[in-house]
Amino acid sequence: MEGLTDRQLEVLRFIASQIEDHGYPPTIREIGEALDIRSTNGVNDHLKALERKGYLSRDPVKSRALIPTSAAREALGGGETGSNVVPLVRGPARPGSRMIEIPIVGRVAAGMPILAQERVEDTVQVDAFLLGTNKKVYGLRVQGDSMIGDGILPGDYVFVKKQLNADDGEIVVAMIDDEATVKRVYFEGDRVRFQPSNPRMAPIYVRHSDFRSTMILGVVVGVYRKLT
C-alpha cells in the first residue's frame, strides 16, 4: 500500500470526521472550503490519488459517495469498526459529555417501501455532540439495501430530524402510498424523484401535482451501526 502525503492524509481525515459527525461524507466543494483547496480539480486530484492508493472508495457521479476503506481506517487509527458509522455501543463517555436518549420508533425500508411502525420499540443513548444542533430526532431501523451507496446498510439505524421540507438531494424518510421509505429526494419540474443509491434499484416517482409536504417525515442526519 502506497503511503500518503500530508495533504492526502488531511483530506482523508476530514472525510472520516465528517462521516462520524454527520453520518454522511462531505461534498467536493465542502472539502475544498474546509482545507483551503482553491479548485474542485485540486480536490479531485487528491480523491483520485486516495482511490488509486486503496484508501477511498468513490462513485464519480455522486458528490457524497466517498467511503474510507479498511486501509484508511487503519491509517487513521480506527481499526476495523468503520469510519462511515458511529457505533451505538461506545467506550467510556468523553469528559463533560452529555448523553441524550433517542427513541427508536420502528423500521424503514431502504428497498421496497414498508410501513414504519409509529411506536417506540427501544431507545438508544448517544453523545449529544454527535447530533449537533439537531432537535426532535428519532431513530428508525433500516431494512433493504437500496441506500448502500450512501453507506446505509441493512440493520443500521438512521437518525431522522423531524421536518416537512427538504433540500434537493437530501436523504429523507418519505411516506409514499401510506408506506415509509428512505431515499434521496430530487424536485424535477413536474415530478419528484425518490432516488436509491444502489444502482440496481429503480427510483420512485411522484407527480408534482400529487406531492404533499406531509410526505416528508424528516431528513436523515446520521446513520449509526450497533456493534456486537
Curated annotation (Swiss-Prot):
NCBIfam families in the cross-refs: lexA (TIGR00498)
Protein name stated in the entry: LexA repressor
Subunit-structure text: Homodimer.
Keywords on record: Autocatalytic cleavage, DNA damage, DNA repair, DNA replication, DNA-binding, Hydrolase, Repressor, SOS response, Transcription, Transcription regulation
S-S bonds: none
Family under the similarity heading: Belongs to the peptidase S24 family.
Gene behind this protein: lexA
One MF annotation (Gene Ontology) recorded for this entry: DNA binding
